[in-house]
């Protein structure tokens, strides 16, 4: 019994060490909305080691009443997936905006933020693919 416990403990420790993706919490400034938007970025552990490599990137959009942490709560294994699949995940927190530019609320320009502000901010900070060949959005 003691051997099984020790083996299980060592196995769990090894699994934890293998999954070492970086999970960053960022505040991306939006000039169009005049505020900072919270964003969680999950990137493979070695994303900065090969400067010539560009990682595919998936933008994960949360649902109504969610936030930038929603996808980590839904799928806690995202860091391990980022490492295994060599992919970056970006999770913006946009409140209950529906990701659109509002015609009623002047400073609710989330479509503008996503396309003109978030993508360039992510591409400046992380070595991700900068065109549709390596970019996806889902939610």
List each model region and its residues.
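Sec-dependent N-terminal signal peptides
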Residues: 4-15
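Non-catalytic cap/lid and distal C-terminal segments of serine-dependent acyl enzymes
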Residues: 20-139
């Amino acid at each position: 019994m003691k051997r099984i416990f020790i083996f299980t403990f060592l196995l769990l420790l090894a699994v934890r060490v293998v999954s070492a993706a970086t999970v960053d919490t960022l505040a991306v400034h939006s000039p169009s909305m005049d505020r900072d938007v919270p964003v969680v970025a999950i990137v493979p552990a070695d994303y900065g080691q090969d400067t010539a490599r560009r990682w595919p990137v998936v933008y994960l959009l949360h649902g109504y009443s969610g936030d930038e942490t929603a996808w980590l709560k839904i799928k806690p294994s995202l860091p391990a997936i980022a490492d295994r699949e060599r992919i970056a995940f970006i999770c913006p927190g946009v409140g209950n905006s529906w990701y659109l530019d509002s015609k009623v609320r002047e400073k609710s320009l989330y479509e503008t933020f996503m396309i003109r502000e978030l993508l360039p901010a992510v591409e400046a900070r992380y070595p991700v693919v900068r065109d549709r060949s390596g970019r996806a959005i889902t939610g």
